From Swiss-Prot:
It comes from the Bacteria. NCBIfam families: PRK02655.1. This is Photosystem II reaction center protein I. It is found in: Cellular thylakoid membrane. GO terms for cellular component: photosystem II reaction center; plasma membrane-derived thylakoid membrane. InterPro entries: PSII_PsbI, PSII_PsbI_sf. The keyword Membrane applies. One of the components of the core complex of photosystem II (PSII), required for its stability and/or assembly. PSII is a light-driven water:plastoquinone oxidoreductase that uses light energy to abstract electrons from H(2)O, generating O(2) and a proton gradient subsequently used for ATP formation. It consists of a core antenna complex that captures photons, and an electron transfer chain that converts photonic excitation into a charge separation. GO terms for biological process: photosynthesis. It comes from Synechococcus sp. (strain WH7803). The gene is psbI.
Amino acid sequence: MLALKISVYSVVFFFLGIFVFGFLASDPSRTPSRKDLED
């Protein structure tokens, strides 16, 4: 039962991380101030 809970949480955090990463990756294109930090 513990393994099932761990696998479910890992999948949820995996998709959540992809969503957050995709949101932050598309953010600099809209905000010029974010591009200054990358340089």
